[in-house]
Amino acid sequence: MDRTFVMVKPDGVQRGLVGEIVSRFEAKGLKLVGAKLELLPEGRVVEQYREHLEKPFFPGLKAYIMSGPCFLMAWEGKGVVAVVRRMVGATNPAEAAPGSIRGNFALDIGRNVIHASDSPESAARELGIHFAAGELVDYSRIDEPVLYE
C-alpha cells in the first residue's frame, strides 16, 4: 500500500485543527501509520524544503515552520498521495476548492495550515526525514475489506 507524509504546520496546530484534519483523512478511509508532535530543528526544516533554499521566501518559511509545534503524520492507502493532495487543496488558499482543508481553513499562502507530499518520490523522501523506520506501524484497519476491491 502507498504511503505519504502530511504535516500540520504551526498555524494549524495553534488553531486547534489537528483533530479535524486527522478525522477527515480517517473518514476517507486512509490509515494513520505514524504521528508525532514536534518542534522541528533547523536541519530537518532545511532538508524538508531543500527545493526552496534559494528562493526569496525561504527564510520566512523556515522561521514560520520553526515558530511552533508541527504535527507530523504518515498516512497509508491506495493512491494516497493524490487522494491527500486533493483533500488538502491548492497551495494558495485563494485557489483551493471549498471543502478542501485549505479551502475551509486557510486564507494566506504563507499560512496555509498543512503540507502534503506532492509525489510518491517526495513522500518517501519526506517520510525518511521525519520518521525512523521503527516509528511507522503496520496494521490492518477493520474496515479495509470494504474500502478496497
From Swiss-Prot:
Pfam families for this protein: NDK
Keywords: ATP-binding, Cytoplasm, Kinase, Magnesium, Metal-binding, Nucleotide metabolism, Nucleotide-binding, Phosphoprotein, Transferase
Metal-binding found in the keyword field: yes
Location, primary (coarse class): cytoplasm
InterPro entries: NDK-like_dom, NDK-like_dom_sf, Nucleoside_diP_kinase, Nucleoside_diP_kinase_AS
Gene3D superfamilies: Nucleoside diphosphate kinase-like domain (3.30.70.141)
UniProt enzyme class: transferase
Example of a GO cellular component annotation carried by this entry: cytoplasm
Function of the protein: Major role in the synthesis of nucleoside triphosphates other than ATP. The ATP gamma phosphate is transferred to the NDP beta phosphate via a ping-pong mechanism, using a phosphorylated active-site intermediate.
Molecular function GO labels: ATP binding; metal ion binding; nucleoside diphosphate kinase activity
The protein's required cofactors: Mg(2+)
UniProt protein name: Nucleoside diphosphate kinase
Active-site residues annotated for this sequence: H115 (pros-phosphohistidine intermediate)
Gene name for this UniProt entry: ndk
Binding of ATP, residues: K9, F57, R85, T91, R102, N112
EC number(s) given by UniProt: 2.7.4.6
SUPFAM superfamilies: Nucleoside diphosphate kinase, NDK
SMART domains per the UniProt record, alphabetical: NDK (SM00562)
Catalytic activity: a 2'-deoxyribonucleoside 5'-diphosphate + ATP = a 2'-deoxyribonucleoside 5'-triphosphate + ADP; a ribonucleoside 5'-diphosphate + ATP = a ribonucleoside 5'-triphosphate + ADP
BP-aspect Gene Ontology terms: CTP biosynthetic process; GTP biosynthetic process; UTP biosynthetic process
Family annotation (HAMAP family): NDP_kinase
